[in-house]
Amino acid sequence: MITIITFIYIILSLLNQFIIIYGMIPVQCGYNLTRRIPVCCPLSNINGKVCGGPKYGECIQIWTPKEKVPSVFLIDDRIDWPKRYFTYFCQCFGNYFGAACDECWFGWKGKHCNKRSIKIRRDIKTLTDRELYIFKRLIVLSQTWPSGYLLIDESDNWNVDPLTKPKLEHASVQYYITYLHRYGSRSTLYKNVQDCEDYGILNFNHDGVCFPIWHRYYNLLWERLMTKIAIQVFGISDYATPYWDWIGLRHCDICTNRYIGAPGRRSEMGLHISSGSPFSNLTEYCYEPMKDLLCSGCQKGGKGIITREFKKGNLPDVEDLKFVLSLKQFHVPGERLSPVCLSFNIALEGFCGRPGADPNHRWFHNKLHVLIDGSMCCTATASNDPLFILHHIFIDKIFEVS
């Protein structure tokens, strides 16, 4: 799969060029957005210069590829991203990164971002008590720790376009992370039911060639934000997020209070996490009273408390893993209409699988979300559960060895 590795390298290199793809709206650029000034080129925290100055980056007009898009999608602010927000951004030089080119690109460190940074991700069940405490503490702190980003209020579909001076709100790390996952997966915010039913089909981070690549970058962003907390609270600059190896398990063996929380009380929202876990009252951002509601933004349903249903069922086993890894074609156009599983990408995500492996058509990555259920059920809320990042770091590990 050498060609796929090359493709991923090209994609990530392009992401490094224009930092608005890093997330939503950097706090430093909120003023300009509300006044329809199309420039997001902040001052560096290192030297106070725009984009860090000539050694770090420069403020330039962004170029985006032109694609033929059906007119029904043109109201979507994600089309021709990110030009509905800004047209001028910092282009960082070398390994510099960040909204103002004052950070290092992933895998690099040092004053000049020229030293390799190696992080080792490990199975959560191999962590020491101290390491496990740090992981849990970072999750809890991320609920209130400032992310440095502003989010657009999508509580209704009438005032979300950046051209209409939308309401912006500051976001904690966890709120930002959940919003970002929802923003990438939600359908277009149409203003009437008929358009929604007819055209509410877009999903930019699932059910397609983008799934593993988008989530790899997402994991890196998340890990970077947690590292920033770890530096200030624990003095740890090389924090690496653990993963959960669930291959061949018959139940969630880390759904205990030692790890990510045992089952607790039940309410009208569902089965909550045990009060003996620090995760028992984690906020469920982008809460959805009705699962997978089309044409609705993150704030439509308000906030809840995370839940898990812990459904019974075998998780994918070694034979399922071997089947996924045996598929050497990364993507096969039109495969979703085929009864045969042909590509690694779609098998990894779980829209097809080993013949006869699951009569309920629940495979690999998707199967875990279905069995855990609760907050993990849906793209809007899944990333609120700490289990999400453990699961997706493991999926990324499989992607890496493919």
Which sequence ranges carry the predicted segments?
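Classical eukaryotic N-terminal signal peptides for Sec-dependent ER targeting/secretion
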Residues: 1-19
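C-terminal accessory segments of proteins
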Residues: 22-93, 100-106, 111-402
